[in-house]
Structure formats: structure tokens, C-alpha cells
Amino acid sequence: MNLVPTVIEQSSRGERAYDIYSRLLKDRIIMLSGPIDDDLANSIISQLLFLDAQDSEKDIYLYINSPGGVVTAGLAIYDTMNFIKSDVQTIVMGMAASMASVLASSGTKGKRFALPHSEVMIHQPSGGAQGQQTEIEIAAEQILKTRKELNTILAENSGQPLEKINIDTERDNYLSAQDAVEYGLIDGIMEKNANLK
């Protein structure tokens, strides 16, 4: 059971109650938390498009705490981040693993951050296949194609050679916030709001 806090704001016209996520959206803050699936992706994409249509000159702040999830859903968010005109600042809090690490590194260059005790984890995509031999071969080819696509994005975002990304994503590879900065996945560590290390 997920309880969503309510925030009450006073104005000259009286009180107004918002769920916390709607209130954060007024400040151009989007929360990407939990496993990435189609429903979460649709919610994030809708918020990105709404904020960009509202004012494409202002930054959007995407806070990420996610174990990753469905690659196609994550790539839909990735494509939208690149499609809109607004700069997207990414801020990792807690963990950005798997597909979430790709999104964290895909924020606007110079505006990709992590909180001091957060972690980033990169690895190869996982999947399973069953059925006839040809179906298993098709699934294996698809996962190899997906791995190449994700590693290419990580290489572009980090500035690391694709060969290094291929090696470093063979297994789960956990990076502290500082390690993620040195690797090139993020640009800085946020000690305080708008105060970068």
C-alpha cells in the first residue's frame, strides 16, 4: 500500500490540497522511483512533455532512485529526454541501477548529479527465453542488440571507449557517487540544494 502525502497551500483564494508529486511538478521536479515499467515510463514521459510545453527555457529536475527495469520503457523515457527542448537535470538519490543508470547519465551534460551517498550500477541487460530453438535464437540476438545499444549510449554519455564499457558491464559494476563522477556518468556531487562539490 503506497500512501502519497498531501500538501496544503494557502493562497488569497483559500486553501488548496495537492498530492506531493503534483506539488513538486509545479517546481518542475519529477520523481523517478521504483522499477521502470510501461506505467512509470508513461507517467514520466507525460510530465516531461507537460513541463516542456509549459516553458522549454527552464530546466526540468529528474530525481532518480530506481533499480532499473524494462529496457523499452527506459528507452522511451531516454528518447523523450532528448526530444524535448528543456534541459533535463538528473539527480541520483539512493540508487540508479541498470536502465536507471542509463537515464541518470543521459541528463543534459554539465547537469548530471548525485547525492553524496548514492550509488550507480551498470551491467549488461538480462532476459530469458523459452520455446523452440529459433525463438531462443531470436531472443539471444535481440538481447545482444540491446546490450550494444545501451553500451553505446553509456559510452557517449561517459566519454569512455565502447570497449571499456563492454568490459565494465560484463557483471554488476557498482560505483559510488565519486566513482560515477570520475567515470563520466555524472558531472558532480550535490552536497546541498544547488551547491555542487
Curated annotation (Swiss-Prot):
Q: Under the GO molecular function aspect, what terms does this record hold?
A: ATP-dependent peptidase activity; ATPase binding; serine-type endopeptidase activity
**Where is it found, in Gene Ontology cellular component terms?**
cytoplasm; endopeptidase Clp complex
The record lists the catalysed reaction(s) as: Hydrolysis of proteins to small peptides in the presence of ATP and magnesium. alpha-casein is the usual test substrate. In the absence of ATP, only oligopeptides shorter than five residues are hydrolyzed (such as succinyl-Leu-Tyr-|-NHMec, and Leu-Tyr-Leu-|-Tyr-Trp, in which cleavage of the -Tyr-|-Leu- and -Tyr-|-Trp bonds also occurs)
Q: Which SUPFAM superfamilies match?
A: ClpP/crotonase
Query: Which CDD domains does the UniProt entry name for this protein?
Result: S14_ClpP_2 (cd07017)
**In terms of domain of life, where is this protein from?**
Bacteria
E.C. no? 3.4.21.92
**What family is it from?**
Belongs to the peptidase S14 family.
The annotated subunit structure for this chain is:
Fourteen ClpP subunits assemble into 2 heptameric rings which stack back to back to give a disk-like structure with a central cavity, resembling the structure of eukaryotic proteasomes.
HAMAP family, per the entry: ClpP (MF_00444)
**Role, per record:** Cleaves peptides in various proteins in a process that requires ATP hydrolysis. Has a chymotrypsin-like activity. Plays a major role in the degradation of misfolded proteins.
NCBIfam families reported for this sequence: clpP (TIGR00493), PRK00277.1 (NF001368), PRK12553.1 (NF009205)
In its UniProt entry, what is this protein called?
ATP-dependent Clp protease proteolytic subunit
| Species this protein is from | Pediococcus pentosaceus (strain ATCC 25745 / CCUG 21536 / LMG 10740 / 183-1w)
Q: Which lineage ranks, top first, belong to the organism behind this chain?
A: Bacteria, Bacillati, Bacillota, Bacilli, Lactobacillales
